[in-house]
């Protein structure tokens, strides 16, 4: 199967593309310099030059959504331009990495530029004959950004420093190698009978403090776990979708820790 993978230089792309290739998929992952998805003319010129002979598109290219900065409306417009410029090309399978941020509260539509763009893209993906949304709430792995919760917690633990949680809440954190299992399943299931939406979550739900305790048990020493807010926050979780013999949260945390030692 020939796959066009957008956003391949991001955390998820750098983790799963080698796994796709190892399993025999033929993956093309142009950089943003090679393929500027925001610019319609650039997209046309790229495919006029290189052709478009793909069986599937995995769309991971996205702007915004970082908790360390606030998004403006340009994030929404640029995300939608990238999406529309690539979904217009016909493929048997179109996989979109959705986000838990596309809905909030009791299934309410997102009110942030990033979240609303994800909501709009997920709705369009549902209408694609071979479309599937893989909804991610939290994803972790060796190559994730240093400011992400689990990476920060592991580094604090290694340095024997306190692990700080701003506000405790139920949080679906999913190992990137398990995300790959969901992606592979979505690519291989017959088009037309594929699920339109899959939540990339585990059956059991954990608070951030539970996850911090898992980190705190990775070696012989212990560190303080500090929670700044007394009141618990809203859950950031999804319903369990599919069982694919996952590695699981605890083992995934251990594997990341061992890789970072």
Please provide the spans of the model-predicted regions.
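Conserved Rossmann-fold NAD(P)-dependent oxidoreductase catalytic core, especially the SDR/UDP-sugar
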Residues: 84-114, 132
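SDR active-site strand-loop-helix element
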Residues: 6, 30, 57-61, 94-100, ...
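NAD(P)-cofactor binding segment of oxidoreductase domains
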Residues: 50, 70-95, 120-123
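NAD(P)H-binding glycine-rich loop region in Rossmannoid oxidoreductase-like domains
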Residues: 40-78, 101-106
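N-terminal Rossmann NAD(P)H-binding glycine-rich loop of SDR-like oxidoreductase domains
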Residues: 3-23
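NAD(P)-dependent short-chain dehydrogenase/reductase
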Residues: 111-115, 119, 123-172, 176-185, ...
């Amino acid at each position: 199967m020939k796959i066009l993978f957008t956003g391949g230089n991001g955390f998820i792309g750098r983790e799963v593309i080698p796994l796709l290739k190892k399993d025999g998929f033929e993956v093309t992952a142009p950089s943003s310099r090679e393929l500027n998805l925001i610019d319609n003319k650039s997209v046309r010129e790229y495919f006029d030059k290189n052709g478009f002979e793909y069986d599937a598109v995995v769309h991971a290219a996205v702007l915004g959504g970082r908790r360390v900065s606030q998004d403006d409306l340009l994030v929404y417009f640029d995300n939608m331009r990238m999406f529309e410029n690539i979904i217009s090309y016909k493929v048997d399978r179109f996989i979109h990495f959705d986000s838990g941020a596309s809905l909030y509260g009791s299934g309410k539509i997102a009110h942030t530029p990033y979240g609303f763009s994800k909501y709009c893209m997920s709705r369009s993906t549902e209408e694609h004959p071979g479309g599937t949304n893989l909804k991610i709430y939290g994803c972790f792995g060796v190559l994730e950004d240093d400011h992400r919760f689990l990476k920060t917690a592991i580094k604090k633990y290694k340095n024997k420093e306190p692990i700080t949680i701003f506000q405790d809440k139920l949080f679906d954190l999913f190992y990137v190698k398990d995300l790959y299992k969901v992606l592979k399943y979505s690519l291989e299931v017959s088009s037309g009978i594929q699920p339109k939406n899959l939540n990339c979550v585990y059956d059991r739900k954990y608070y951030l403090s539970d996850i911090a305790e898992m980190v705190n048990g990775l070696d012989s020493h212990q560190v303080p776990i500090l929670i700044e807010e007394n009141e618990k926050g809203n859950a950031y979780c999804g319903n369990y979708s599919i069982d694919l013999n996952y590695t699981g949260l605890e083992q995934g945390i251990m594997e990341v820790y061992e890789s970072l030692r």
